[in-house]
Amino acid sequence: MPARRQWFGDRRVLKRIVLAVLALVILPYALIFFYVLPFIHPVSTLMLRDLVLLRGYDRRWVSLDEIAPVLVQSVMMSEDGQYCFHGGVDWAEMRMLVEDTLKGQATRGGSTIPMQTAKNLFLWNSRSFVRKAMELPLAVSTDFVLSKRRLMEIYLNIAEWGPGIYGIEAAAQHHFKVPASKLTRRQASLLAVSLPNPIDRNAGKPGRGLRRLAGVIERRAQGSGDYIKCIYE
């Protein structure tokens, strides 16, 4: 009898573990529908980490209409030029990324804005194949459920732009002492090119390399045209 009771006890523990894992897997997909609501202001896993570690952070939510269009253009041209045309994942870019990895070559990031948004909202920051495998379906779901405008609004309000600096309003105030609505084309391009590594790339105090990259993105943003129609139609 004791062995039988232990068996049933072990099964109950296992069942609880399985249910907990399933809940963790399902929760992000449920939250995506919740984030459709415009008055919901999501936070990122990095923000939650900072709160747990008692670091605090600066994030001031702004609507997409309160963000200078030049910033949106610059970010799209820097991070995801095909944003308006793919369904969350740029499969052509992903295929090239896999091919480069199999050849042992240095790889590009390959992450679209929906992929980065899914990672920032639900996953951890360090790179791994496990994280990427979880990121892909989350990105497709996020892009399917949210409008392109809402998705961009969330992304720009949770992206990290420096230690403890999250969202474009806090970034604009921190680096340039202006609201996000007043960013110039050069300031916008500097903020855009700092996104891949905001801890080491300081948009407010750019080095020569960062200024050169910003110049390239600034020119691309000026000719963005059809690439941004899903945001500004």
Curated annotation (Swiss-Prot):
GO-annotated biological processes: cell wall organization; peptidoglycan biosynthetic process; regulation of cell shape
Localization, UniProt: Cell inner membrane
Pathway(s): Cell wall biogenesis; peptidoglycan biosynthesis
Pfam families: Transgly (PF00912)
Catalyzed chemical reaction(s): [GlcNAc-(1->4)-Mur2Ac(oyl-L-Ala-gamma-D-Glu-L-Lys-D-Ala-D-Ala)](n)-di-trans,octa-cis-undecaprenyl diphosphate + beta-D-GlcNAc-(1->4)-Mur2Ac(oyl-L-Ala-gamma-D-Glu-L-Lys-D-Ala-D-Ala)-di-trans,octa-cis-undecaprenyl diphosphate = [GlcNAc-(1->4)-Mur2Ac(oyl-L-Ala-gamma-D-Glu-L-Lys-D-Ala-D-Ala)](n+1)-di-trans,octa-cis-undecaprenyl diphosphate + di-trans,octa-cis-undecaprenyl diphosphate + H(+)
SUPFAM superfamilies per the UniProt record, alphabetical: Lysozyme-like
Assigned EC number: 2.4.99.28
InterPro entries on file: Glyco_trans_51, Lysozyme-like_dom_sf, PBP_transglycosylase, Pep_trsgly
GO cellular component, one term: peptidoglycan-based cell wall
Regions crossing the membrane: 17-37
Top-rank lineage group of the source organism: Bacteria
GO-annotated molecular function: pentosyltransferase activity; peptidoglycan glycosyltransferase activity
Protein name: Biosynthetic peptidoglycan transglycosylase
Organism: Rhizobium leguminosarum bv. trifolii (strain WSM2304)
